Amino acid sequence: MNDMPKLGGADPLQAIDELTWELLWSYVRDDYLWFVVGLFGLLAALYFVNYFTRTGSIARATTKEAVRQPIFLLLLAMGSVMLIVNCYIPFFSLGDDTKMYIDCGLATILISSLLVAIWTASLSVAEEIEGKTAMTLLSKPITRREFIMGKYVGIAQTTLWMILFFGVLLICLIFLLKAKLDAKESSLTMTSVECLSTALRILPGLALVFMEVAIMTSISVAISTRLPMLVNVTTCLAVFVIGHLTPVLVLTSLGNVPFVKFVAQLLATILPTLDNFNMSAAIAMDAKIPADYIGYNALYSLCYVSAIILLSFILFEDRDLA
């Protein structure tokens, strides 16, 4: 039997495969290049802060302390188990199981990262202040502002590593299992490139999750400068719930008494609008999240975090550590 004929001296199957991956690369380059650039920019900024500033020594120590905490390993293990188990559980969504799985996976990553951030802020800031450890640190050539900034950066980069770990795991599960299982149930066939393009749809969600966690981390650090863990956890939970409901509060207050409208608009102004970081609707509608939307939310997160960190400086400036 003759071998398969060659086209231009190349195997046609190999040429088709190379063309397919070139199309995938162009798709990634056009839609997700901002993610790669933003991630490397963030990692470069963290590297500079960690190794070229006095704040970095506190940030590195905070990250090491957070990673060694049992709750970090527990949430990492529980989150991984949930992602793996949900991959095999049918959602009975009439062909949209992959969308439901992505939504549940991003929610799992968000909750796990938030719990780590709030818990670490309470331990690393509030208990160090109450246990007089902070006074020992501040007796060295480290200012109170560097202490707060170092704690925030350390907690934020801890959640970043957790989100990246979960993100890689979720992409692998969608690429290797979930997309193919969903297609098989619908009597369809998906190529590896199609499975990978489906898996990469979570990248905007991961970016939005980190922005939301960064905002909540700054709030938790600010509260920890004055209040103990229980109050911190309760307040952050309330801010998280109300922050996701602020658009609803504003809409429902229209036409009501002026006082109710004033309170709703005040809450919407002071508290972060966390619903902007929710991409459940985009997943359900199979809509693409544009890069400018991510950019606007990144700018909003940066401004809000900066304001809360400044508030933390004010709250901690006259705190008695003796």
Tell where the protein language model's regions lie, with residue ranges:
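Hydrophobic alpha-helical transmembrane segments of multi-pass membrane transport/permease proteins
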Residues: 70-91, 108-115, 232-244
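Short cytosolic juxtamembrane segments of multi-pass membrane proteins
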Residues: 231-232, 240, 317-322
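Helix-capping/transition residues at the boundaries of transmembrane alpha-helices
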Residues: 65, 126, 137-139, 220, ...
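Aromatic- and glycine-rich beta-strand/loop motifs that create alpha-glucan
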Residues: 53-72
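Short, strongly hydrophobic alpha-helical membrane anchors
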Residues: 1-28
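Junction motif at the cytosolic side of a transmembrane helix
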Residues: 48-55, 222-226, 303-322
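Secretory targeting signals
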Residues: 26-51, 84-124, 148-226, 252-255, ...
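Transmembrane helix boundary and interhelical loop/hinge segments in multi-pass membrane proteins
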Residues: 52, 56, 118-138, 142-144, ...
